[in-house]
């Protein structure tokens, strides 16, 4: 599973505020909410929360891609996330 490999890398750094760690946490929350919404389609409050978390993760990924493209590519590949479209 992807989670174990990423956790080992992040726990070595012990940087809870790093962009990678925040994106990792948001990705876990997104996956949990997505599975919840498959069962509860009319849970609109959770849908709103999911959209907010998606926006936060998108902003963090945009920041990381501007600052360090190599770390961005590694994180995208580790978490199995699609690359965001840039304007």
Curated annotation (Swiss-Prot):
Residue ranges of coiled coil: none
Keyword Ribosomal protein: yes
Record GO terms (molecular function): structural constituent of ribosome
Keyword entries, A-Z: Chloroplast, Plastid, Ribonucleoprotein, Ribosomal protein
Record's keyword annotation contains Metal-binding: no
Subcellular location: Plastid, Chloroplast
Organism whose genome encodes this protein: Nicotiana tabacum (Common tobacco)
Source organism phylogeny: Eukaryota, Viridiplantae, Streptophyta, Embryophyta, Tracheophyta
Pfam families assigned to the protein according to its UniProt record, in alphabetical order: Ribosomal_S15
Subcellular location, principal: plastid
A GO term from the CC aspect: chloroplast
The encoding gene: rps15
Single GO BP term: translation
CDD domains the record matches: Ribosomal_S15p_S13e
Top-level lineage group: Eukaryota
Protein name per Swiss-Prot or TrEMBL: Small ribosomal subunit protein uS15c
Subunit and partners: Part of the 30S ribosomal subunit.
Family of the protein in this entry: Belongs to the universal ribosomal protein uS15 family.
């Amino acid at each position: 599973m992807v989670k174990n490999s990423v956790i080992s890398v992040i726990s070595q750094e012990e940087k809870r505020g790093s962009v990678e760690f925040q994106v990792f946490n948001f990705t876990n929350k997104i996956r949990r909410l997505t599975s919840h919404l498959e069962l509860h389609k009319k849970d609109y409050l959770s849908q709103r929360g999911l959209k907010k978390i998606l926006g936060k993760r998108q902003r963090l990924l945009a920041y990381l891609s501007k600052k360090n493209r190599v770390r961005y590519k590694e994180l995208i590949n580790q978490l199995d996330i699609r690359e965001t479209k840039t304007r």
